């Protein structure tokens, strides 16, 4: 159901469904990843407030702790670039560190394209 809401760009409903799934599947990294994607609400990270960004990063970090995957690090790199770098805010790790991790864990172009497709945000060249 959560994926249907996400495909229909019903981000609040999708987030609620993924949040409920986290309770029942707390060891499934993808649930945390997609919950974080929902918080973007189809808008660039740059346009969100810091509290929303922090929640996204919390969910991505949870996904990484369960199963480190390249696309999770890429999502983190996207946030670190589009929010922190564009607002001239220093953060550790920075987007370059996250990109390095994404490549270390393997992040094929198909995963990156899928991220941008489900997130509903324009593709950003952060390399």
Language-model regions: role of each:
Residues 9, 36, 40-50, 77, ...:
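Short coil/turn linking the two alpha-helices of tandem helical-hairpin repeats
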Residues 30, 71-72, 111:
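Start-of-helix register in tetratricopeptide repeats
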Residues 86, 90-127:
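Terminal, low-structured helical/coil segments at or just beyond the last alpha-helical repeat
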Residues 1-10:
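Alpha-helical segment of the N-proximal tetratricopeptide repeat
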Residues 34-35, 75, 115:
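Canonical tetratricopeptide repeat
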